[in-house]
Amino acid sequence: MSSNTFTLGTKSVNRLGYGAMQLAGPGVFGPPRDRHVAITVLREALALGVNHIDTSDFYGPHVTNQIIREALYPYSDDLTIVTKIGARRGEDASWLPAFSPAELQKAVHDNLRNLGLDVLDVVNLRVMMGDGHGPAEGSIEASLTVLAEMQQQGLVKHIGLSNVTPTQVAEARKIAEIVCVQNEYNIAHRADDAMIDALAHDGIAYVPFFPLGGFTPLQSSTLSDVAASLGATPMQVALAWLLQRSPNILLIPGTSSVAHLRENMAAEKLHLSEEVLSTLDGISRE
């Protein structure tokens, strides 16, 4: 069984963290329906052992960071807050690239201000190339150099990447030390298998998003059947599979519900047998 912790930057974090995206309003735009509930979810997450929170100032925009500050400031020493830059929101709630030096610098300062911090623990460069929905090839040298300069200025402790290809990871590692990569990955969507193993070899965290994303009905049925046999939810099984997939995988499931938060956190105690793992591994081939 893999360890329940992994080093992210210079801190050891619990591998089951929390993603704050769903704390904003519908479509990750505007304020939440109930700010008090959002604050309660964050405080309960820490009470359940979460010490790794994933956020961004373009969630809302500004909303999730402001709620995190209201709920948790002053922050405990063992809490790692990871944020992202490289995108912005249009007035119509669209997601737009924000890769110019001025936009990247503004994003870092917006995150600092709204989180109430003098330095950011980890900043992921969110890459939006091609259609912006999945990784696409293209140089990220210019953008990463801007982020590395802000690291040298003391505004950012550690640098990560999001929505990137293996070629971009290699390019980035020539410019700065990379502590994490955040891409889409789950039982059904396993394009990053080789990347995960390579990053694990080098002690770099891999943070998958959309743990139930991109499933066909057949794949969902298989997962549901496995979950039912274990007395668990499909999400719990999907999260448990990820935890057992590789020791460098850190999870950031998001929710705006305390009940769902508790369900997600219970996945840490769910051990999947070799037989169950084999069945789940077959999902990506269906």
From Swiss-Prot:
**Molecular-function annotations in GO:** aldo-keto reductase (NADPH) activity; pyridoxine:NADP 4-dehydrogenase activity
Q: Which reaction does it catalyse?
A: pyridoxine + NADP(+) = pyridoxal + NADPH + H(+); pyridoxine + NAD(+) = pyridoxal + NADH + H(+)
The UniProt annotation places NADP(+) binding at: 210-218
Catalytic residues in the record: 59
Pfam families in the cross-refs: Aldo_ket_red (PF00248)
GO biological-process terms attached to the record: pyridoxal 5'-phosphate salvage
User: Which UniProt key words apply to this protein?
Assistant: NAD, NADP, Oxidoreductase
Q: Cite a GO CC annotation.
A: cytoplasm
Entry annotated with the keyword Cytoplasm:
no
SUPFAM superfamilies for this protein: NAD(P)-linked oxidoreductase
Look up the EC number in the record and give it: 1.1.1.65
Q: Does the keyword Oxidoreductase apply?
A: yes
Q: Report the sequence similarity comment from the record.
A: Belongs to the aldo/keto reductase family. Aldo/keto reductase 2 subfamily.
What does this protein do, in the record's words?
Catalyzes the NAD(P)H-dependent reduction of pyridoxal to pyridoxine in vitro. Is not able to reduce 4-pyridoxate, and to oxidize pyridoxine or pyridoxamine. Has Kemp eliminase activity towards the non-physiological substrate 5-nitrobenzisoxazole, producing 4-nitro-2-cyanophenol; this activity is not considered to be physiologically relevant.
Q: Report the NCBIfam families cross-referenced here.
A: PRK10376.1
Query: Can you name this protein?
Result: Pyridoxine 4-dehydrogenase
Gene name, please? pdxI
